[in-house]
Amino acid sequence: MVKHMCESNLYSEGGDLLMEDVIFIEVLEDGIRATDILDSQKEFPGKLTRIDLDKHRIYIETED
């Protein structure tokens, strides 16, 4: 059985690349926490708005 990695890139709704190779998203009260394939974590204020599984893109509306 072949397993495929399913990394995605994290973008702001404005199209800015925020993080690459994201494999885990946790929704927090005041934002999201993203974890990449190297187990590096970053927190972003804002909310998850959409996920494009075909293009491997995750979008968040950031609070600037």
Curated annotation (Swiss-Prot):
It holds the Pfam family CooT. It comes from Methanothermobacter thermautotrophicus (strain ATCC 29096 / DSM 1053 / JCM 10044 / NBRC 100330 / Delta H) (Methanobacterium thermoautotrophicum). This is Uncharacterized protein MTH_1128.
